[in-house]
Amino acid sequence: MTLAAVAQLNSSGSILKNLAICKELISQAAAKGAKCIFFPEASDFIAHNSDEAIELTNHPDCSKFIRDVRESATKHSIFVNICVHEPSKVKNKLLNSSLFIEPLHGEIISRYSKAHLFDVEIKNGPTLKESNTTLRGEAILPPCKTPLGKVGSAICFDIRFPEQAIKLRNMGAHIITYPSAFTEKTGAAHWEVLLRARALDSQCYVIAPAQGGKHNEKRASYGHSMIVDPWGTVIAQYSDISSPNGLIFADLDLNLVDHVRTYIPLLRRNDLYPTI
């Protein structure tokens, strides 16, 4: 078994403050013996509005954020999965990206951009149009090799599409990560149900680092970072209401993945519906 660390954050509009928190959590995770740490969506910042998001994405502090996290991965000898905003080739558009950083040289070995964007209007809740600022990703990437096993990348709203989880499992994933920033309303109704469902669909561990708490006067996130095993059991959940930033841990056992897949083989009828 191998120890995984999952971070919960309450990111603000200050990239450097968020960076300091991330570096401290990397240090804490490594000190506990974790081999890999996972951070939520928008670890670098959560902006007040679209204009600020574009401005911050192109600010030099964003480059420093990634550079310093890479250095921390090397310093503490730990794999890091972190989500950031990145400039795109289209003016006034950004990419919502999940980066895997290896600890030997601090190299980025995988860069996934969110495929499904969050464009919703919630009655008595927020209206969010991610497509106003963000380009959707155009690829599902092969799972990344880590000390925990092969980890497939998805981000937040991707969780509502079981086809992506099944695709990642078919590409060899033992684990799927869903770094997220769910709204309080959708989180309370759907968060745990979706995480457990994707674990059952794919027969993978599901790792779900989350943003939690009030970010600014317009935005708050649900929190409740979780780790779910391939049987659909929640084996760790962030519940420290006294601290908006912190860690949860769990030992991941790939033998359990094999056991679940052997015990309940999912023999698909691809003569009746398309192969994913």
Swiss-Prot record:
Keywords: Cytoplasm, Hydrolase, Nucleus. SUPFAM superfamilies: Carbon-nitrogen hydrolase. Its EC number is 3.5.-.-. The keyword Hydrolase applies. One of its GO terms (biological process) is diadenosine triphosphate catabolic process. The active site is at E41 (proton acceptor), K114 (proton donor), C156 (nucleophile). Disulfide bonds: none annotated. The keyword Hydrolase applies. It is an enzyme of class 3 (hydrolase). GO terms for cellular component: cytosol; nucleus. It holds the Pfam family CN_hydrolase. It is found in: Cytoplasm; Nucleus. Residues 1-254 form the CN hydrolase domain. This is Probable hydrolase nit2. It comes from Schizosaccharomyces pombe (strain 972 / ATCC 24843). The gene is nit2.
